[in-house]
Amino acid sequence: EGRAPADELVFMLNGLDTDFDGENNFYGANTIPFYYQHHPIEISTNELIRAYVVNILEFDPVNNFHLHGTLFHHFPAGTDTVPSGFNDMLTMSQGEREILEFEYKYPGLYMFHAHNTEFSEKGWVGSFLAKDSEKNYSDEN
């Protein structure tokens, strides 16, 4: 059957050791620190968003993804069509990958970030800008 149609995106969670001391100086989603904080990802309300998330962070054993304003279904390694959980935060070890599926009901600016203060302060933070879609949302959903 496959997965339902969705607006899809990829997050490569990584860090940058700019002084080669074996510790990351910056963190980010898709390499550029703070990029999605200054350039929010535009999405439509009431439409399924599918994020392919890969933790390629070096020098730190775990990373995580926290989403504000809604919850997501997650699929470890993307190997099943049945979600293994429904949450707003996910912790991943090095090399781990997940598929996250979520929707926003209301328009607005919604933050996503690492749930590690150091990572967020050094660049792993961003936002989704949810805009009204043409779809009508039923309170029954």
Identify what each model region corresponds to.
Residues 1-141:
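Copper-binding active sites and cupredoxin-like electron-transfer domains
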